[in-house]
Amino acid sequence: MATKGVVKGIVSNLVTVEVDGPVSQNEICYIDVNGTKLMSEVIKVIGKNAYVQVFESTRGMHVGDEAEFVGSMLEVTLGPGMLSKNYDGLQHDLDKMDGVFLKRGDYTAALDDDKLWDFKPLAKVGDNVIAGSWLGEVTENFQPHRIMVPFVFEGGYKVKSVAQAGQYKVNDVIAVVTDADGKDHNVTMVQKWPVKRAIPCYREKPRPFKLLETGIRIIDTFNPIVEGGTGFIPGPFGTGKTVLQHAISKQAEADIVIIAACGERANEVVEIFAEFPHLNDPHTGRKLMERTIIIANTSNMPVASREASVYTAMTIAEYYRSMGLRVLMMADSTSRWAQALREMSNRLEELPGPDAFPMDLSAIVANFYARAGFVYLNNGATGSVTFIGTVSPAGGNLKEPVTESTKKVARCFYALEQNRADRKRYPAVNPIDSYSKYLEYPEFESYISNHIASDWITKVNDLKMRLHQGKEIAEQINILGDDGVPVNYHVTFWKAELIDFVILQQDAFDSVDCNSSLERQELMLSKVSDICRTEFDFEDFLEVSDYFKLVINIFKQVNYSEFKSADYDKYNKELDAILAERIK
């Protein structure tokens, strides 16, 4: 029999319920408020009192209102039909909801129960299967969507029957499997999984090593991220976080893109809803939305649903990874998620940590980031979840707790800087403060050596050192003036500017420059490295600046020309001729 309870206290979204039976941490309950059932989650249990966070506004709730516990955790519904959907943090389909504001207690189904899917069996009668094994597949927006043995099944099973190829609804039985005790279990296209638990259906989770190509030079060349890697983008307001995220999600070599807009301002979420359906996928020529899922929670939505949205997004990402697909998940912004954790922690009167965030903030962030990764599935296929979160530190302060906690666990750090944004040097990623720990991985080094160039990482480290030198000399020039430093200092400074203007800066709104292939980046890196290693002969600092401005200008024309086109070759020859004039 389901456990019931009575409301004893209300503090905004935190409600104390006195229960008449057993309840567990993270269990879902529904509180009846004037006939409307409000979804809630247990976050703490002390004696007979369960503290629950309500996913809706608690206006109109009274002491004495009844609550009913469902006996399960917050779960997502997993099955075909999720691609192209717009969900809220609890996986309710926003497109099915009417009105400007969402009605309280209005919950919609995540999947379309009536749609017919073309099913094709992959398993045969008599096959031995375990949780996560592929039984068949349907085509969802041109992607193969594998129908798997439910993740909750434990131990080994034998396939008793599989449906023939044909059209079926998501709730139709497509297979029957028999467990070790001889008991039969029906399998449909749909399964449920609790969002707070990672899906464990894989054989091995090695260190990721395969470069994830994004087409953004400051990422791919200077601070690469890998398939199954983690990264984060901190930056103050107006530094281009959202544009950079859009560019990554549009251009990255991923099969599925999941965007969790957890607590962003309403106008930014509207921008995502308005823009994404019109974006073209450069890989397939189709609409990007066909392989995208958007999970949106604005800042004015209740705190609890903001927290749930990132877990919902990650669980869906893990589900697609279990099909052997490459998934890219973007969260914008994890700061709002951390603020939601802070709010509930404060209401529970827990011991506060720095800036009143929970004491265990680092552990919560680390556990979440650990769910990303590259895996070998039980059938030998590979899948990955690459996670990139943005952080919006108050006042651009990169020493605040959320940034510090994320820095400990994310392997890539792309620091957006107000100073670079003010000078219109986009993407405004600071090349000196940013880093990628993957450059230190031996597996990644050997992958780069075998697939791109053996001296790639050496050249990148050399250019990074030159950027450091350029920054130091720029400070000296600012203090002493142009005449106060030797000419060779000016040459070093302008070589750093060349790296910045040619490789680091990129036009996200130009159809050619927005996306650089790895082959193109390799040629650019070699060319810029050669220029930086060349000794030039100049009389004074004016000659240096005039010459390098000319080189940068021609290089910009190369960047705006289609790769290996007539214009591209023409500007490259022009560049070679100008460089030959000045070599010592």
Can you annotate each of these PLM segments?
Residues 20, 34, 72-73, 91, ...:
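Short, surface-exposed secondary-structure boundary micro-motifs
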Residues 221-222, 228-552, 556, 564:
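P-loop NTPase catalytic core
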Residues 74-78, 93-99, 182-185, 205, ...:
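Active-site phosphate-binding and catalytic loops of NTP-dependent enzymes
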Residues 54, 59, 119-128, 158-167:
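Short histidine-centered loop motifs in beta-beta connectors
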Residues 43-49, 80-91, 143-166, 184-199:
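Short, compositionally biased
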Residues 1-103:
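N-terminal accessory targeting/assembly segments
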Residues 99-133, 137-140, 145-152, 169-229, ...:
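P-loop NTPase nucleotide-binding/switch module
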Residues 546-583:
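Long, highly charged low-complexity segments enriched in Glu/Asp and Lys/Arg with interspersed Ser/Thr
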